[in-house]
C-alpha cells in the first residue's frame, strides 16, 4: 500500500441531526475518509484521531437551554479548520464568546442567502448575482435559534432577511459557521462548499476512491486472516456478494461460502448465485437446499414476527450443520456496514462488533469460537455498491432492489405454503421483468408482489373460477425512512396485470398498493 488512505481524515461530531450521516456520505463522495462520532467524544480520542478538519453537525436542541450539548474543548485546541453546520455553528458561536438567541421566526425549507462577506469558504461559489452585484445561494434551512452576536475575530459571511448572521467566518483560524445545510441536495452548491472546506481549507487529498478502498481492504483482510480459513454466509444480497468478491480477491481458496436455499428466494435466484460465484468467479460455495426444512417449520404459522423468528432459527440450524462439516475454520465473515456500526452502541467505542440480526448467524460465534472479519464496516451502502463494481460484479446485481432476509416468507401474508411461494415467485418475476423493459426498474427504489391468501372470483371462457389475489408494490425513496408509492404508468400496470393473470393459473386478480410510508411500511409484514 503506497499511501494510507485513512491518513487524511475529517472528524464529524454528531449533535443528533437527521442529516448527520448525509454529511459523512458527502465527504466520502469528495474522496476523503471521515468518521462520525457523538458530540461528547473525549479530548484524548479526538487528539488520537488526528483529523485534518472537524465538522460540527446539526442537532435538535437549543444552545441557550441548560445542559444542551457542547463541542469538546479539543476541537478548538487542535489548530485545525472547523466548520459548524446549523446547531454546530450556534454552539461554536456560543463557545467562542458570541451569542445565540431563540427566534419567533423559524426558517424551515428553501431560502436564499446573500453572500455579504469575503471568505475562502464561499469565494466564487454562487447561484445568482443580482443587479447590485450581490452573490446569492439557494439553500435549505431548518432552524429556530440564530446567532445574534459574533464571537471575536469573526465577520458576517452571509445573511437572509430574518437571519442576519446566516454564515460567519474567521479566516485566520479557519473557523466557519453556516446556518443552512450544505449536505442536503436542496442546497444547490452544497457539494462545492463541503469540497472547498475538506480539500482546500483542510488540505485533505482525495485518496478515498473505490480502487484505493479495495486495495486497502484486501491488504487489511490478508493482515488479519493470514493463512487461516474464513466462512461466509452468502445470501445473494449486495452486502454479502461484495464481501464474497472482496475476500475471494484477498484470500482465494481460504474462503468457503455457505449459500442456504430456503425455498423463499426469487425465481432462479439460487441458480444465479451459484453461476455467478461458483462458476464465473471460482469461489468455493456450498449450496444447502433446505426448502423442505424451512417449509415444514413454517407450516401452520401465520404470525409475521413468529415467521421471521422461525426462518432465522432454521437458517442458523442449516448454516451450523454445514459449517460443522468443515475443518479448520477460524474466521466468520459478515457484511456489517458503517450505518450498522453507528446505530449499534451509538458507535461510542468505535469498536462495537455487532452481528446483523438479519444475517441470522447469531448462533455461530459462541460454539465455534470464530473471530469476525467485517471488511465493509467502514463503508456506507452507496460505497459498497461502488466497491462491488470495482471488483467486477455486474451492475444489475449491485444495484438490485433490497430483498428482505426472510425472503418471500414476509411477502406471503399469513401461512407460508409451497404453492403460494411458487405462484408469488412467478408473479414477482413478471413484474420486475416488465419494470426493466419499460425502464422503470431503476426509477423505483423497491418493487415486488405480495401474495394475499384470499380467493376472488374470475371469469375464464364461459366458466367462473375462484383464484388467489396478489398486490403489486413499488415505492420511491431516498433513505427508506419515508417513501412514496411510485406513480407507474397505467399502461405498464395493465401489461403486468394481464401477464400475471393470463400466464399464472391460480391468480385471478391483481391490485396496486397506493399507500405511502408513513403510515404504511414498505413491506406488508
From Swiss-Prot:
**Pathway entry:** Purine metabolism; GMP biosynthesis; GMP from XMP (L-Gln route): step 1/1
Query: Could you tell me which Pfam families the record lists for this protein?
Result: GATase, GMP_synt_C, NAD_synthase
Instruction: Recall the GO molecular function terms of this protein's record.
Output: ATP binding; GMP synthase activity
> In the UniProt record, does the keyword rRNA-binding occur?
no
- Enzyme class name: ligase
Q: What does this protein do?
A: Catalyzes the synthesis of GMP from XMP.
Question: How is this protein named in the record?
Answer: GMP synthase [glutamine-hydrolyzing]
From which source organism is this entry? Ectopseudomonas mendocina (strain ymp) (Pseudomonas mendocina)
Q: What is the lineage of its organism?
A: Bacteria, Pseudomonadati, Pseudomonadota, Gammaproteobacteria, Pseudomonadales
Instruction: Name the encoding gene, please.
Output: guaA
